[in-house]
Every structure is written in structure tokens, then in C-alpha cells.
């Protein structure tokens, strides 16, 4: 029974309930398909009751659905009875929106006119499948709608055995209502389950394929599923991004934990350092007493040593004085002897000078005689040569007088000339010379080729040997560097610097070196290039004067450094100011100077002067360097460019010519770097041995083979050359003989033409006789001169002997004098030593006497101060408690000196203070432990979340993969169900056709009027005719429906269409109901609602559809609740089990 609080003339007194009655199922059409009878199962979420207060046209309305016995409910009544209001109230009461019910855009528009508040109470069942365990038998949802807002109250209702209802409020939150609705699978916005009046009319009136497809997607929720998959994928990506972000935060937290642990370690170290400082301070209290004891003991030892020293010094001074007296006596004796020797030397020197003058006179006479002898001898030789020449002329003249003999000789000479000429021509034209020379060229070519091969092998050997030397030098430098880093500039560099430091007082200005020590390479990439450029200056020393340079050379010599290992010394003025106006290239280019950093201005100036490195630019690529420096406009002030492998490109300019020298390549030796100590000596030694083996192999095998082959070719070449030389010699002899014979013949012909000259012969004979007479005279003169020389030599001999005796005497006297002088000097030196030693001994005695009193007073003073210090220690002990583990007094045997201890305490205290500044004392062990546990939990949670996300991602991927199958299965299920429902009527042929690309759903159904014509063949696939949104058919028999417009002119050819245009309004409504019921098949909801579904049906279709709906609800879907609203009469409805009917009266006009 319906109930209300305030009666109204225009309001239902009570909805009238019609009971169940028998229905004759045989009245159905003969070809109606039978439906399977399903088992009735209790399902949670059905509507048990609805109560409305001031909702739309209802002031107070309550309807109770007997869900325990029924699952199909018909609510009938004329227009104005509030059926649609009840429909909307169920949707709104469960949390629906006002715009979803086509009765208003806002919720407040549903409040009854004249009132300010509306209330909807929906009671749902909570028994059977999917029941909520936290609620009782029923769930009541009460929504109160005000003008500004709406509120919810959700109650749990327990039904007692006496049918009493006990309520308890569970929640007042909309979110909890939404969760209950979602749990019961109630789709508030699904048009298939909430087929309102306006939605039914619009759907029946505008049955376009696109609209039907849209209804299909909304009803089956496929589109929402696809979009939810996309949103879920985005949400997963965001979650993974958050996990990554959280992982970064965890990493930061780990760093923070590490810093906290470091702080704890620092705190522990601080405690240890403070304990050590306390121990040192405790021992320092006693250090003063210890120092006084040590000083007193030292003073006593000094007193004993002073007394012993005084006695020994007195004895030494007495000995010194006695020895000095003896030396003075010896010196005086030597002085007397020296005076006598000086007089004898003067006398001997005068006698020697006289003897020398006599000898010189005799030697001058002998030289004059020897000059005369040479003159006479030369004159004699000239006469003898003249005689020989004259005799030869006479002989020649006499031979010319016999002409017959000359004719014979001429004939013989001419015959010989012809024979020799013939032999020469045969040798020149025979071709033997060309063959020999061709053979020689071949041998020389082979020889040069072999020499090239030998040169290549020798070059490889030399390169290997240079590499061996470089590697050995690297090893030596590495070993030297390990001893002292400065040795990278030379193996003796540490010794040199040590000796310079010891001898620095000898220098005017201490030399600076090695220069490489003051140079730092900024860019290590250019180490090899910089070494190529200024590496030879790295071990040089800079001296400010030549005197300092000479002292430094003496140091090199004293250290016995080999000449080849001695550093170069550069002498230059040192003013301590670096050059400023340098001729550098543009700043766009890197230069040798710009990659170096100088720590000394004088070294800076020397490197600039010696290398001009500020004008050497650096270019990595060799080709780029050649193009840049070889162009017509090279960089200004750039003299040349260096590359990474040490190649050099000189700039092309008006005063210079472009040149390029390829670098030898290699690795830097570490002169300007810190990598010298990183040499792997074991690997380097193995490399040296391998290189030596390779060099030995080349020398013993390849080189010897080349030498042997060269020797063979060399012998062949020499043999060929010898053959050529022999041939040339023979040919040359023949030519010489030919020329000689030709000249002899010419001379003989000339002699035959001459006549003998007798006067000439006579004159020559006279000249010969005259000169022969002069020769004996010259010989006699020479004999006289020789006799004179013999006499002078005889007279000079005794004088020479006397001179020798005088020289010997003088030498003997001078030797004795030198011996006396040497002995006298030695005595003088000895005397000076005794004087110096005596002076020192005297000073020592005076000092020892003075120290005697000082030591006595010092001892007394130290003892007094020690007593004061002991008293002070006792007072300090009161303010400085003894640290744990120490003794009183402490053991100071291994404790450092007081000054060193104070310095250490000060350093330790400063270190403690510095560490205290950076130490966070608020970090305790408990903090670290808690933070560590928290971080561990956080990491575990992140790991778990990440695992869950991966599992969700896999599930999502599986669902995305299964989505096409779900879509296809849904389509097949809807199509099959639609075919099954059409078969119930038995007058329709067709089905549903999906086009997912065009997003259309064609309902291809044909009336039974064409069934016979189309029997036995499939329906044609016909063209869809485009229909205006407001065009309808004219064959509807429902006068209440809207008027239809004509679709085509009568004269136009009819087309068979695929939509429902060819059906009547009732048939179209039946097909629509069949489609909606097909959609119900694929979606689950505890209850389904349809309002005015039969608006366009004729009586026959309406009854058929109503009975069909009842049968479907009660037999096919007994576990679902169906609520149908209709303005038509329901008296003709067959009453069956599971059906409950309500009739509502008109409440408004």
C-alpha cells in the first residue's frame, strides 16, 4: 500500500497493487521461441522500497517492492501520475546527477513547488550474492535536497523475526554511497538500464546507426573500458615516475644516512682526540719538573766535563809552548844558512853570464862561415847543370847529321801507327764495352735495391735501439723519480740541488733550476708537444753571473757527473720582473705559452728568450695546421704551429717561407706532468727485452742475409768494373800509342827537313870547358872556409865546457837555497799553527774558568726553580683531574719534549675545534638507528610498490591484449541475443551489423510482409538511405506519436533500406526493445528500468513485448530486478509468478 502524510485532491490515495493471476501461454504466436527457465537466485542491490517527500509532483509517496517473491515490476498510470518522477527519484536517490534524468539541469529543480526541501529514501537489499558483510539485511540511502546543496545518510537496517526494522546510521558521506553503488554494480549513467521517457522517445524517433552505435558503446561500457585502460596506463606511468622520484629521494636519504654515520664516526674520533688531549695535558703538568731535573743533571755533567777539560787544556797549552820554542830555534839556524847561499848564487850567476857571452861570439862567426859555404855550393851546382845542358845540345846536334837513319825510323813509325789505329777501331766498334756497361747498370740497380732494404732494416734496428734507450731512460727516470720527484729532470738532479743548498753561501745569487720545476702544464693533452718545444730547457739552470756559473760547474765536476748528463747553465740577469709586452698571436689560438704557468718571473723570461714559445700556436689537426700556416694570411705573430704529434708548420710570410716537418710521434716522458711515477717497471722491462729480441733478430738474421747478398752483388759489381776498367785501359793505351806514334812521325819529318849547325856545336863546347875550369876554384874556396870553421869550433869547445860547469854550479846552489826556503816555510807554518793552537787553548782556559762559576750558580737556580715547579704541579692537579688510565706521576720516558708536547697539544686542540665546528652533536646512535630503520622500511615499501606496479602493468597488458576479444565477444553476444529475441515475434528477418571504423550500428530488420519473397535467400545488403533527423514514417498506427514527414517524392524509385524506416512504429518499438534487452544480456546490474518503452507500439506489439519482458524477467533473468513504467493500460497483462503490478493515479493535470 502506498502511504502519504498529507492528503491532496490531486494526489494518489494509494497505489493500487494488482495480484498475480494465471496467464494462458498458448495465446502467444505459434512461432514464438521458448526461453530457458533460470533459477531464481537472491542478488544484493535490488530496490526494496522508495520513499519520496516533496519530490517533483509527489508530496509523500512510498512504494514497497516485494523482492523476496517478485523480480518484475510494472508501474502503470496515466500521464501526470508521477511515474517519471519516481523513475528520476530512484536515480537521484542513489547519487545520480540531475542532468542525467532529462527533468532538470540541477538537483534543486526536482524540489516540489512551494517547498524548500526534498527527501528521497531508497532501500536496497543486502542478502544473497555480493552482499556487503558490514551491513545488515537492508541498506537505506536517504538523500535530502536543499536549494543550495544535498546531504546523504546511509543506514543499515536489520529485519527482525517480527518484521520490525532496526536502523543504525553508518555514514553521511557521498563517497561511501558511491562505494555501495559501485559494489552492487549499479550503473547510474548507463542508458540501457535507465531508459527514461525522454530517452526512449528520442531513441525511437532518431534511430540512426551512429546513435545506435553510441548507445551500444555507452550501454556495454566498452568505450569507458578502453578509456580506462588508457587512463590506467597513464596512471601507471605516473606511478613509475613517482617511484623513480622516490628512488632518487631514497638515494638522497642514503647519502644523508652516510653523512650521519660519518658524523657519528667524527664524534667517536673527537672523543678519542679529546681523551688524547686530556692525557697530553695531564702529562704536560709534570713536564716542567722533568725539564728541571734534566737540566740539573745536564749541569752536573757539564761541571764534570768542564773540570776534565780544564786539566787537559792546561797540559796541552804547556806542550804547545815548548814545541813553539824548538821551532823558533830551527828557523833562526835556517836564516843564517840562507844568507850565505844568497852570496854564492850572485857570484855564480856573474861567472855564467860571462861564459855565455863568449859562446855567443863563437857561434856568430860559425854562422857567417856556413853562409859562405852555402853560397859557394849553390854556385857550383849551377855550373854543373849548365855543363850537362850544353852537352845534351851538342849530342842532339851531332845526331841530326845522319838522314838515312831518320828515313828508316819514319817508315817504321808510320807502320806501327796504322796497326795501332786498326786495333783501336776494332775495340770501339765491337760492342763489348756496351755489354759490360749494361751488365754494370743491372748490378748497380740490384745493389742499390739491396742497400735500400738494408737501410730499411738498419733504420728499424736504429729505431728499436732508440726505443730501447728511451725505455731504459724512462725506467732510470722512474726509479730516480721514485727516490725524489725532482729527478724526473735528471738522475743527478737531487744531488745537485742538495749540493747547491750546502754551498749557497758561495754564490752571489743562488742558481735557479731545474727550470722545469718552475713550469706547470695547464693542459696535459699537449705534454708531448711542449716537451718537443722546450723539453731541452727543462733541466737547465739559471745563474745571474759568470762567477756563479763557474761555481756551479765546479759542483758538477765535484759530483763526478758525466759530461753528457750535466745540465746546461744559462747566464742571464735576474731582475724578478716578467716580460709584459709579448708579441703573441690572437687569443683565438692556443699557444705553447698559454698552456704553461710560470711560478718564477726570471724563468719566465729565460724561456721566452730561448724558445719564443709565445709565438708558437697549437693546432690539433695536422691538415688544419698546414692549411692555416701555408695560406697567404697566416695568424699574425705566429711563427709556427705545433700539432699533437709534434709536427711543425712554419708560417708563410714576406720574410719567411712555408715549411712543414712531420713529427716523430710518441708519448710524453712526464717532464711537465705527474705521471712519471706511474710507470709499470715490470711491463716496461718485458717490453725492453722484447724490443732487444726483435733488434737482435733483425741483426742476426735479416741484416746478415742482406750483408751476404750485398757482398755477392758487390763482388759481381767489382768484377764488372774491373772488366770495364781493363777494357778502357787497353783502349786508352792504344789511343796513347797511336798519338805517340803520330807525334814521332811528325817529329821525324821535321828533323829530315833540318840541316846540321856546326858553329853552334863549337860554341857549346867552349862554354863547357870554361865552366869546368871554374868548378875547382870554387871547391878550394869551400875547403878554406871549412878549415876556418873547424878552428873556430875548436876554440869554442873549452868555453862551452866552462859555461856548462858554471850552470851546474849555479843550479846546485839554487837547489840548496830552495831546500832551505822550503824547510824554512814549513817551520814558519808549523810555528803559526802552534801560535793559533796556543791562542785557542788560552781562550779555552779563560772560558773554562769563567764557566766554572756559571755552572755552580745555574745548578742552585735550577734546584730552586724545580721546587717551585713541583709546588705548582700540586696546585694544578686540583684543577686538572687525572684522566682514566693515567698514573700519578705519569711515565714520561717516551713523552716528547715540552715544546713539542705543547705544539702537539695546540695542533690537536685546533684539530678538535675544527672538527667540532663540522660535527653535529645532535645526531645520536638512536637517531642513526631510527633513520636507518625508516630508510629500510621505505626501501622495502618502494620495492613492494614497484612489484605491485609491475604486476599491475602485466595485468593491464593482459587486459589490453584481451580487449579485442572482449569487444568481439560482446558484439557476438548482443547479435545472438538480438536474433533470439527477433525470433520470438517470428515476423522479422535480419540482425545487427557493426562497422567499428565508421562507428555505426545498423539494425537490419525486415517486416514479415516481405518474408515470402525473400524466403530461401539471405537479405540483400542494401544501401542506407540518408534520413533527416526529423523525418519519420507515415505508416505508424499510433495516433499519439509525432507526425512523420514524407521521405521521398512518389515518382522516385523506391530503395530497399537497412534501417527501420520500412517498419511501423509498433514494430520499430519492438525491435528497439529487443535491442535494449540484448544490451542487458552483456551487462550486470541488480535492477533495470524502462519508462514508456511502448510509446510507439500498437496493441498487438505492445502486448507481445510486455509479455516477452515479463517472461524474460521472471524466467530468463530471475536474479535481476526489472521495473517497467508505462502510461498504457496493464489490464491485459498476463499475471505470472514473480510479477508485481502498481497503478498510480493522476496527481497533476
UniProtKB/Swiss-Prot annotation:
It comes from the Eukaryota. The flexible hinge domain, which separates the large intramolecular coiled coil regions, allows the heterotypic interaction with the corresponding domain of smc-5, forming a V-shaped heterodimer. This is Structural maintenance of chromosomes protein 6 homolog smc-6. Transmembrane segments: none annotated. The lineage of its organism: Eukaryota, Metazoa, Ecdysozoa, Nematoda, Chromadorea. It comes from Caenorhabditis elegans. The keyword Transit peptide does not apply. Residues 461-687 are annotated as: Flexible hinge. Core component of the smc-5/smc-6 complex. Involved in DNA double-strand break repair by promoting sister-chromatid homologous recombination during meiosis. Also plays a role in the DNA damage repair of ultraviolet (UV) radiation-induced DNA lesions. Promotes efficient DNA replication. Residues 1042-1058 have a biased composition (Basic residues). One of its GO terms (cellular component) is nucleoplasm. GO terms for molecular function: ATP binding; damaged DNA binding; single-stranded DNA binding. Signal peptide: none annotated. One of its GO terms (biological process) is meiotic cell cycle. Residues 875-900, 1026-1060 are annotated as: Disordered. Interacts with smc-5. Its main location: nucleus. InterPro entries: P-loop_NTPase (IPR027417), RecF/RecN/SMC_N (IPR003395), SMC_hinge_sf (IPR036277). Residues 309-460, 714-920 form a coiled coil. SUPFAM superfamilies: P-loop containing nucleoside triphosphate hydrolases, Smc hinge domain. Keywords: ATP-binding, Chromosome, Coiled coil, DNA damage, DNA recombination, DNA repair, DNA replication, Meiosis, Nucleotide-binding, Nucleus. Expressed in the germline (at protein level).
Amino acid at each position: 500500500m502506498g502511504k502519504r502524510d498529507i492528503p491532496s485532491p490531486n494526489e494518489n490515495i494509494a497505489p493500487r497493487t494488482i495480484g498475480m493471476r494465471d496467464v494462458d501461454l498458448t495465446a502467444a504466436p505459434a512461432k514464438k521461441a521458448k526461453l530457458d527457465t533460470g533459477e531464481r537466485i537472491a542478488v544484493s542491490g535490488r530496490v526494496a522500497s522508495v520513499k519520496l517527500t516533496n519530490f517533483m509532483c509527489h508530496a509523500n509517496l512510498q512504494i514497497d517492492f516485494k523482492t523476496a517473491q517478485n523480480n518484475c515490476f510494472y508501474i502503470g498510470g496515466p500521464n501526470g501520475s508521477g511515474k517519471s518522477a519516481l523513475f528520476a527519484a530512484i536515480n537521484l536517490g542513489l547519487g545520480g546527477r540531475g542532468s542525467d534524468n532529462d527533468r532538470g539541469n540541477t538537483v534543486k529543480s526536482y524540489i516540489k513547488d512551494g517547498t524548500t526541501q526534498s527527501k528521497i529514501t531508497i532501500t536496497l537489499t543486502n542478502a544473497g550474492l555480493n552482499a556487503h558483510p558490514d551491513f545488515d539485511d537492508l541498506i537505506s540511502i536517504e538523500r535530502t535536497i536543499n536549494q543550495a546543496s544535498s546531504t546523504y545518510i546511509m543506514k543499515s537496517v536489520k529485519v527482525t523475526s517480527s518484521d520490525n526494522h532496526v536502523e543504525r546510521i553508518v555514514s553521511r558521506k557521498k563517497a561511501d554511497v558511491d562505494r555501495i553503488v559501485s559494489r552492487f554494480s549499479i550503473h547510474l549513467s548507463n542508458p540501457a538500464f535507465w531508459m527514461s521517457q525522454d530517452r526512449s522517445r528520442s531513441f525511437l524517433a532518431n534511430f540512426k546507426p551512429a546513435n545506435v552505435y553510441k548507445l551500444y558503446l555507452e550501454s556495454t561500457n566498452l568505450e569507458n573500458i578502453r578509456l580506462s585502460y588508457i587512463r590506467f596506463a597513464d596512471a601507471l606511468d605516473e606511478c613509475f615516475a613517482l617511484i623513480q622520484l622516490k628512488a632518487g629521494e631514497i638515494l638522497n636519504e642514503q647519502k644523508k644516512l652516510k653523512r650521519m654515520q660519518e658524523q657519528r664516526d667524527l664524534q667517536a674520533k673527537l672523543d678519542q682526540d679529546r681523551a688524547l688531549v686530556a692525557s697530553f695535558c695531564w702529562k704536560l703538568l709534570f713536564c716542567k719538573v722533568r725539564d728541571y731535573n734534566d737540566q740539573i743533571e745536564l749541569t752536573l755533567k757539564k761541571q764534570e766535563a768542564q773540570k776534565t777539560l780544564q786539566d787537559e787544556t792546561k797540559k796541552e797549552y804547556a806542550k804547545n809552548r815548548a814545541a813553539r820554542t824548538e821551532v823558533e830555534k830551527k828557523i833562526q839556524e835556517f836564516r843564517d844558512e840562507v844568507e850565505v847561499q844568497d852570496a854564492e848564487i850572485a857570484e855564480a850567476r856573474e861567472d855564467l853570464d860571462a861564459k855565455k857571452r863568449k859562446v855567443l861570439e863563437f857561434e856568430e862567426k860559425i854562422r857567417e862561415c856556413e853562409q859562405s859555404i852555402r853560397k859557394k855550393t849553390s854556385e857550383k851546382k849551377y855550373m854543373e847543370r849548365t855543363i850537362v845542358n850544353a852537352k845534351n845540345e851538342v849530342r842532339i846536334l851531332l845526331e841530326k847529321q845522319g838522314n838515312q837513319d831518320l828515313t828508316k825510323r819514319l817508315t817504321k813509325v808510320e807502320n806501327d801507327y796504322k796497326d795501332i789505329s786498326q786495333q783501336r777501331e776494332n775495340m770501339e766498334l765491337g760492342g763489348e764495352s756496351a755489354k759490360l756497361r749494361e751488365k754494370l747498370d743491372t748490378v748497380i740497380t740490384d745493389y742499390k735495391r739491396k742497400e735500400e732494404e738494408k737501410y730499411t732494416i738498419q733504420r728499424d734496428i736504429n729505431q728499436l735501439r732508440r726505443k730501447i734507450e728511451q725505455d731504459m731512460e724512462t725506467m732510470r727516470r722512474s726509479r730516480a723519480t721514485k727516490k725524489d720527484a725532482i729527478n724526473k729532470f735528471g738522475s743527478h738532479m737531487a744531488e745537485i740541488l742538495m749540493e747547491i743548498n750546502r754551498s749557497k753561501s758561495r754564490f752571489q745569487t743562488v742558481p735557479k733550476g731545474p727550470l722545469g720545476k718552475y713550469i706547470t702544464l695547464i693542459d696535459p693533452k699537449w705534454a708531448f708537444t711542449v716537451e718537443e718545444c722546450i723539453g731541452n730547457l727543462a733541466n737547465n739552470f739559471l745563474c745571474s753571473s759568470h762567477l756563479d756559473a763557474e761555481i756551479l760547474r765546479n759542483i758538477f765536476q765535484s759530483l763526478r757527473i758525466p759530461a753528457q748528463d750535466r745540465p746546461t747553465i744559462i747566464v742571464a740577469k735576474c731582475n724578478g720582473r716578467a716580460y709584459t709586452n709579448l708579441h703573441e698571436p690572437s687569443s683565438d689560438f692556443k699557444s705553447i705559452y698559454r698552456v704553461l704557468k710560470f711560478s718564477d718571473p726570471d724563468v719566465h723570461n729565460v724561456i721566452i728568450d730561448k724558445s719564443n714559445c709565445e709565438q708558437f700556436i697549437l693546432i690539433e689537426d695536422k691538415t688544419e695546421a698546414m692549411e692555416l700556416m701555408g695560406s697567404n694570411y697566416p695568424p699574425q705573430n705566429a711563427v709556427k704551429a705545433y700539432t699533437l704529434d709534434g709536427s711543425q708548420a712554419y708560417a708563410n710570410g714576406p720574410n719567411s717561407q712555408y715549411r712543414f716537418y712531420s713529427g716523430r710521434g710518441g708519448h710524453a716522458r712526464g717532464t711537465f706532468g705527474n705521471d712519471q711515477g706511474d710507470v709499470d717497471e715490470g711491463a716496461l722491462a718485458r717490453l725492453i727485452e722484447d724490443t732487444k729480441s726483435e733488434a737482435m733478430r733483425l741483426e742476426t738474421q735479416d741484416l746478415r742475409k742482406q750483408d751476404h747478398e750485398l757482398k755477392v752483388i758487390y763482388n759481381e759489381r767489382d768484377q764488372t768494373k774491373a772488366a770495364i776498367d781493363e777494357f778502357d785501359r787497353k783502349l786508352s793505351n792504344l789511343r796513347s800509342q797511336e798519338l805517340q806514334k803520330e807525334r814521332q812521325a811528325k817529329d821525324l819529318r821535321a828533323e829530315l827537313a833540318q840541316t846540321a849547325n856546326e858553329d853552334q856545336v863549337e860554341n857549346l863546347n867552349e862554354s863547357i870547358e870554361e865552366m869546368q875550369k871554374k868548378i875547382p876554384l870554387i871547391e878550394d874556396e869551400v875547403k878554406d872556409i871549412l878549415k876556418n870553421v873547424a878552428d873556430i869550433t875548436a876554440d869554442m869547445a873549452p868555453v862551452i865546457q866552462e859555461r856548462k860547469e858554471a850552470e851546474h854550479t849555479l843550479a846546485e846552489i839554487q837547489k840548496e837555497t830552495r831546500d832551505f826556503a822550503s824547510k824554512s816555510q814549513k817551520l814558519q807554518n808549523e810555528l803559526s799553527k802552534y801560535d793559533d793552537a796556543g791562542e785557542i787553548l788560552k781562550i779555552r782556559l779563560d772560558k773554562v774558568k769563567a764557566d766554572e762559576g756559571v755552572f755552580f750558580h745555574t745548578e742552585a737556580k735550577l734546584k730552586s726553580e724545580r721546587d717551585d715547579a713541583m709546588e705548582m704541579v700540586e696546585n694544578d692537579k686540583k684543577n686538572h683531574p687525572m684522566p682514566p688510565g693515567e698514573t700519578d706521576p705519569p711515565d714520561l720516558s717516551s713523552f716528547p719534549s715540552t715544546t713539542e708536547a705543547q705544539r702537539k697539544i695546540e695542533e690537536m686542540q685546533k684539530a678538535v675545534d675544527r672538527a667540532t665546528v663540522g660535527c653535529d652533536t645532535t645526531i645520536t646512535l638512536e637517531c642513526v638507528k631510527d633513520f636507518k630503520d625508516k630508510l629500510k622500511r621505505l626501501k622495502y615499501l618502494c620495492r613492494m610498490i614497484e612489484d605491485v606496479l609491475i604486476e599491475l602493468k602485466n595485468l593491464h597488458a593482459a587486459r589490453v591484449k584481451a580487449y579485442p576479444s572482449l569487444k568481439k565477444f560482446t558484439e557476438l553476444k548482443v547479435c545472438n541475443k538480438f536474433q533470439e529475441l527477433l525470433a520470438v515475434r517470428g515476423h522479422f528477418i535480419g540482425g545487427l551489423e557493426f562497422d567499428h571504423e565508421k562507428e555505426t550500428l545498423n539494425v537490419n530488420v525486415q517486416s514479415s510482409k516481405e518474408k515470402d519473397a525473400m524466403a530461401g535467400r539471405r537479405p540483400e545488403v542494401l544501401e542506407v538511405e540518408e534520413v533527416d533527423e526529423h523525418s519519420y514514417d507515415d505508416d505508424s498506427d499510433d495516433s499519439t506519436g509525432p507526425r512523420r514527414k514524407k521521405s521521398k517524392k512518389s515518382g522516385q524509385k523506391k530503395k530497399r533500406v537497412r534501417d527501420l524506416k520500412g517498419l511501423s512504429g509498433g514494430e520499430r518499438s519492438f525491435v528497439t526493445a529487443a535491442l535494449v534487452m540484448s544490451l542487458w544480456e552483456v551487462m550486470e546490474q541488480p535492477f533495470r528500468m524502462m519508462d514508456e518503452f511502448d510509446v510507439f507500439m500498437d496493441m498487438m506489439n505492445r502486448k507481445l513485448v510486455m509479455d516477452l519482458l515479463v517472461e524474460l524477467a521472471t524466467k530468463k533473468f530471475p536474479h535481476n530486478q526489472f521495473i517497467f513504467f508505462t502510461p498504457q493500460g496493464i489490464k491485459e497483462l498476463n499475471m505470472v509468478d514473480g510479477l508485481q503490478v502498481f497503478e498510480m493515479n493522476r496527481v497533476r493535470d
